[in-house]
Amino acid sequence: MATDNARASSYDDPMSERLLGIAADVLRSFGSGFGGHHLAIVGGAVPGLLVEVPPTGIEPHVGTADLDLHLSLHLLDGETADYYDSIIDGLRSLGLEADIEGDRHIKWRWVGRHRNARVQVELLCPVRTRGGRPEGPASDTPAIANMGPSGEIAALAVGFGHLVPEDTIAVERRVETASGNLTYQFPLAGLASWLCLKSDAIMRRDKAKDAYDVVWTLDALGPAAASDRVASSPLVAGDSAGELEAQLTLLVADQFRDIDSVGPTQYAAFLEGGAGEGERRHALGTVSEFARALAERGVI
């Protein structure tokens, strides 16, 4: 599995090539009752779902060996009580168990081997003190939300996760599942909420792939088309419009302000260009064009 300090050449896990088929296996293991109403794919799997085939001249996206699933507060708050067991049973049916670090069980990260690939599923959720749902911290850490009465599973709270449920979209892909080929409808974070999550990740951790994912996605969609997607998000006209504007402004005007900013620098580092000025200028140019397009559409 690639680490936070990994570069493009580190992403050689077999799951990178079969991620979507394995992702479908994971989601299908939860059962038909789940639908796409309470979870969405976030993280590094999103670019490959948003862009099925990159335009000529753009290298294929360097995939991820992790599957990040964002769960709704409705699920965590017990309004969908039967789903806890569905998630646990589904993950275990694929040979996954809660990860262990030392003597501590990481109940929001499940790992194992499925179809001869090492699989890692991370369960994420909104910060629970938002949206009129204040409550005390969970038993382990304020960033962890326990799920269900058994204490067997949890979710890790992430910044701006509360934007995802309103901005979840569905994307169909023909994939190779464990049961055969299938056209599967994947629920995933829309571009607007996903960029907010990525911007928050760039702020809070030193993982070069976050910046790479942003630049690659904007390149592959095209800055103008990407801004159209953001402008059409229900978040733009909703109660979270101010948060969306502020977080996107942070991304384009601070994290990608100039070639020495963290965004271009991490993008170049991920591509193993080190401090390569060409890679940094490319990243800056792509995000700057996206920023201009957002401004033209009145998003920022």
Which residues fall in each region the model found?
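Compositionally biased terminal segments of proteins
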Residues: 1-300
